[in-house]
Structures are given as structure tokens and as C-alpha cells.
Amino acid sequence: MYKITTIYLWQKSYLSFFIGIDNLDCFTLIRFFQCRLQNKLGLQDILDFFCNLCGHSMVRTCNMVEAAQKQNRITFGSIYVKLHPLVKLCTGIVWAPRV
């Protein structure tokens, strides 16, 4: 139980810091890591997740990502690099962005 709680808290703080969203909870993380178990996660999946999490439209989410990119705070490459270890840890799946 201690290990699971520690992993959850680490993931929550890591993702909260990385994407700037503080309202991540256990159910959100479970949905993110389990909803795509049969598919490889891609950039579209990540944007869909952001949309669902933030309650924003796809256009608004894309604008948020573009604005963050212009400020050098986030890139699609960094999304892949940062989230890959977390996805692998939770699901055992090594995934790559769709081409």
C-alpha cells in the first residue's frame, strides 16, 4: 500500500508540475493510464486527454499548447520524453507517438 501511494503521489506531482494542472486525482490518472491499454498513445491521444481534463475544446487546448511552445515551456517532444517513463511504469507498455 505504501509503495502504491508513493507512486501515485509522485505521478501526481510530476504531471501537475509538468502540465501545470493541479486538479489531478487518482481517477484521472487511472483513466489516463488505462484508457489506451489496447492502443499506443500518440499526440492526438495526449491532446484528447488534455481536453477532457481541462474541459476545454480541442481548439482551445491546441492554442494553449502552442502558447506554451512559444514560451519554450513545453514541446511535443518533451511531452513524449516526460510521460514515457510514467506510462511504462504504470502499464508496462513502451509506446511511441503515432506517425
Swiss-Prot record:
It comes from the Eukaryota. This is Putative uncharacterized protein YAR070C. It comes from Saccharomyces cerevisiae (strain ATCC 204508 / S288c) (Baker's yeast).
